Amino acid sequence: VHDRAASTFQISSAQACVRQVQRLLQRIERRFAMRQIELDVGGEIVPFYRVADPDKVLDDVAREADLRQRLDGRRCADEPVHLPYWAEFWESGAALVAALAEGSIVENAPGLSVLDLGCGMGTAGAGAIVLGHRVMLADVVADALLFAQLNGVLAAKHTGQAPTARTRRVNWCTDCLSERFDLILGADVLYDKTQWAALERFWLAHLAPGGVVLLAEPGRQSGDVFIDWLSGRPWSLQIDKQRIPGREQPIRLLRLKTA
């Protein structure tokens, strides 16, 4: 009886996953051209959907902002335009996945509570789901969360988990969540130094005791300046490099723990 019940759950769970994937694909296809690629999670190959033409998304956002400005006469300062950086498949996200799978930077004990902050299409978060962690995918842009939810569901399906993916619209400058996390991930979130103080406040407010912030960035000058900025602040910093296929230069990893 127990085996039959488990089998029934697996079938119904798989069917629910297929339906959810179909619904999300239909919603996304109404607005975006997309293509499926493969996400390598420590040798596990998982389907992953990304925007087919990120430049077109950028053009569309700029055109909509220009239209609003012409209609209103001005653009309201309290309604900032969020440039669609989320629509790019950033290699830093793949580097976080590789680092998590290898377990060399953060111990890969399944079941960690993980926040993929500024998740974009959900690369790092999807990888963490495949590795057995409890993941929230968070971004300020609603369109990004459609892709993140789809990719999170596909990652959960790959592991046989329930066909759900926790997504949350989060502005790290203003929002406060009701939970803390063992691990906060950030791929290419250091490009704007005016955001660093807000990011730090958010990390400190949402890290569980002993928790880790793991950041990935491709070695930009902004990353160098950020490392200098951290000096004298309440963090211990470990710097590592992560190689990924198809990229000559490694991605820089920054592992932060409260000092």
Identify what each model region corresponds to:
Residues H2-A259:
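S-adenosylmethionine-dependent methyltransferases
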